[in-house]
């Protein structure tokens, strides 16, 4: 059973304090004399209250998450909280090993993680930005490795009785079974009142059942797939921070204000790794490499918004190639202010964009994935098509997903034909496009589930299950009329 581990660090705005944790004895090792060591510990334990702001930093871990060779895991557990009342001013997450050391992308990738506050009994009910969905997402990141940052004087209010859950996606790039831990670090202001912020998760695809959507492909070179959704603001206030999550082939993610002529309030631009970045070297490629950073908006003054007014969230992706399961999500933090201006004043002069990675490229060529199999020594290798017998079918056919294999692995159907994939395994599967003329993207399929799709564009579709990416392939040929 996965467990959590906690360490705590306390600091004041005026002076730095030593770490108060099970290894506080390291202070003694560095002290030259026992008397100095004793004085330091007594000062930490019995120091009088101070007027300066006090912050505590908690380092917590969830795990282990066990991953088989090249597998993808989707943990959705309840997780430990700091059990402190106060205001979160900073939070980050990463993948570490059992010793707390960062794991390289070549071993395990944190594709995304979201922390959701379910509140506590008798407290204010926490809800998402979509009606009927319990819990308040308050921090998330993906390959962008974004940190929750807020301007000075602001914080996300938490109660020591709150319950948190986590939704994460981890991808293994190792043949051997491995274990990983999700480490999350939280800084909480505990001694003074800050201006509270409300987190809002806004998506370009609105309140669809899933947070991802599909770019079908087939557009002209350089063309854009544009998805847009309006979100009514639940409170009046000021946007003081905003992060973003996008996938491979994203071009931008914007928030615009229709009542002020559709002006752009926030423009989240993706930043891509250099051609030799580790994100492009991992094998097998389980998904199209995403941006290594996205522009993170900050402003102490904030952008005024009024309750009920719509803000438009627009995600733009390459439309030439098919891109299944993309995301366009912005996380905005709004400080309540019932007197927020209705005027379309200039945007705050103190606004700035923070980058988790300073260096990178502003754009990359869109791409699709190769199929990846294993050689005789268990090493990943690129393959041109699925291995195994072929079946020629007519207008409709059912493909079984059984023993973590497609049956049949090679299939030919007539133009306009319908393929129905049927999962017979207890393990979950997904059918997704690696490369081909149009997108294929099934939901996660449990035993007995089916997914059907009609094919109106001729060509070769290489498909795989990214939960079992090196063993579970299908090559589908759609014959022209």
Map each language-model feature to its residues.
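Low-acidity, Ser/Thr- and Arg-rich intrinsically disordered low-complexity segments
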Residues: 1-28
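Beta-strand-centric surfaces of beta-sandwich/beta-rich domains
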Residues: 54-238, 243-378
């Amino acid at each position: 059973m996965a467990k959590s581990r906690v360490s705590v660090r306390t600091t004041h705005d005026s002076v730095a304090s030593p770490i108060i944790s099970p290894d506080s004895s390291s202070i003694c090792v560095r002290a030259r004399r026992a008397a100095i060591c004793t004085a330091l510990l007594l000062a930490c334990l019995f120091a009088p209250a101070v007027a300066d702001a006090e912050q505590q930093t908690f380092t917590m871990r969830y795990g282990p998450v066990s991953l088989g060779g090249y597998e993808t895991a989707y943990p959705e557990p309840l997780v430990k909280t700091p059990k402190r009342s106060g205001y979160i001013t900073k939070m980050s997450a990463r993948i570490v090993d059992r010793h707390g050391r960062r794991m390289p992308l070549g071993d395990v990738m944190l594709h995304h993680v979201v922390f959701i506050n379910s509140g506590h009994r008798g407290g204010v009910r926490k809800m998402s930005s979509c009606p009927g969905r319990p819990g308040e997402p308050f921090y998330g990141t993906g390959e962008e490795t974004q940190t929750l940052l807020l301007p000075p004087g602001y914080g996300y209010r938490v109660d020591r009785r709150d319950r948190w859950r986590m939704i994460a996606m981890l991808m293994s790039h190792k043949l051997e079974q491995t274990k990983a831990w999700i480490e999350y670090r939280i800084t909480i202001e505990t001694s003074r009142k800050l201006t509270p912020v409300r987190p809002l998760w806004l998506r370009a695809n609105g309140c669809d059942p899933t947070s991802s959507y599909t770019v079908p492909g087939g557009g002209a070179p350089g063309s854009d797939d544009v998805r847009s959704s309006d979100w009514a603001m639940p409170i009046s206030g000021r946007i003081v921070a905003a992060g973003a999550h996008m996938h491979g082939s994203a071009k931008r993610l914007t928030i615009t204000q229709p009542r002020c002529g559709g002006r752009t309030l926030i423009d989240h631009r993706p930043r891509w790794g250099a051609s030799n970045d580790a994100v492009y070297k991992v094998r097998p490629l389980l998904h199209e490499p995403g941006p290594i950073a996205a522009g993170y908006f900050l402003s102490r003054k904030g952008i005024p918004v009024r309750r009920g007014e719509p803000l438009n969230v627009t995600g733009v992706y390459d439309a030439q190639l098919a891109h299944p399961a993309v995301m366009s999500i912005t996380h905005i933090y709004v400080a309540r202010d019932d007197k927020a201006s209705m005027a379309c004043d200039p945007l705050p002069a103190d606004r700035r964009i923070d980058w988790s990675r300073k260096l990178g490229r502003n754009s990359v060529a869109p791409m699709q994935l190769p199929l990846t199999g294993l050689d005789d020594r268990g090493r990943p290798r690129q393959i041109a098509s699925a291995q195994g017998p072929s079946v020629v079918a007519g207008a409709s056919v059912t493909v079984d997903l059984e023993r973590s294999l497609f049956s049949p692995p090679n299939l030919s159907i007539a133009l306009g034909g319908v393929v129905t994939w049927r999962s017979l395994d207890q393990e979950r599967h997904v059918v997704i496009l690696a490369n081909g003329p149009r997108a294929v993207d099934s939901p996660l399929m449990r035993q007995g589930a089916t997914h059907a799709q009609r094919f109106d564009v001729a060509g070769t579709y290489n498909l795989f299950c990214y939960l079992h990416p090196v063993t579970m392939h299908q090559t589908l040929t759609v014959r022209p009329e």
